[in-house]
Amino acid sequence: MSGLPVFVSAGEALTDMLRDGADNWTSQVGGSTWNVARVMARLGVPSAFAGAVSDDVFGDALLRASAEAGLDSRFLQRLGHSPLLAIVYERNPPRYFFVGDDSADLYFDPDRLPAGWHGAASWVHFGGISLARPPLRDTLLALAVRLKEQGVAISYDPNYRALMDERYDPVLRQMTALADVIKVSDEDLCGLFRCQDPEPALAALRAINPGALYLYTLGAAGARLLHGGHTWSAPAPEVRVADTVGAGDASIAALLYSLMRQPEAGMAQHLRYAVAGGAAACLAPGAAPPTLEQLQLLLPAVSVYNHQAVQS
């Protein structure tokens, strides 16, 4: 693999330990930023996940899954620290905690990435729990600032988790101010702003960076795309849902795919891709990255509305 990727997602790759019954556990590779990179690669975009994983069986599984997805392996660092684990002890509703006090992800070093990578990358994505876990948090914030200064487009999905308490507030403000595209869900907003009504929280978030493009996802109700004083909305198409794991990651990835591959398209079309991507991810169990064919088959089923007109 000689060429450098045009899309990079930086953050955490982890192992979900899922409780099945009283005494049985299964493992599954995951991590929101890793999954966004995997979806982009599945859609045909030369992509990489930039992060660090343990040098053990857990890291081996993530390395294999990354290779199978077509991610550039030069961006995945292997370190002699423990793995980052998400212990999911109840599924519905999900209850979990993270194990990784001194795990490999925390020691990711951007200086070890391939020379010239930031010159080739047109978009770099940040988010997930990586931005809530020092010292990785500070490493990624500094990287995002440097990339922004160099003219690289930044996308950001906070992907709220319980460890994002008031200590995360400065990170939320800084990353929102830096980002060109921000994806957030109604549940994210209620968690991040510690509130019951997501609409005032969305307005508060947008006030930090009024010029950014916001993808606001609403689960089964679809999504909105907001830019300046304009809003587009789209209900989710009807699909046979296997589960919703990874739908948010697929949604932001599909939006970024559309912005990268058809920048001249209107916002209605970009939103179609985002909503179709999220729906396509629901067709298979687990965080299964959708194919471009699956996504494009769903595009005609996505109707986009703006404040004045309806577009079929």
Could you describe each region identified by the protein language model?
Residues 46-126, 152, 298-312:
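Conserved N-terminal subdomain of the carbohydrate kinase-like
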Residues 150, 163-231:
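Conserved phosphate/ATP/ADP-binding segment of small-molecule kinases
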Residues 129-137, 161-166:
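Active-site glycine- and acidic-residue-rich loops that bind
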Residues 1-6, 198-312:
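Conserved phosphate-binding/catalytic region of the ribokinase-like
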Residues 101, 129, 159-161, 187, ...:
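Active-site beta-loop-alpha junctions enriched in small/polar residues
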Residues 11-13, 129, 158-160, 250:
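Active-site metal-binding loops of divalent metal-dependent hydrolases
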Residues 1-69, 308-312:
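Glycine-rich phosphate/adenosyl-contacting loop at the front of the ribokinase-like
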Residues 4, 120-121, 179, 211:
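Short, well-ordered alpha-helix to beta-strand connector turns
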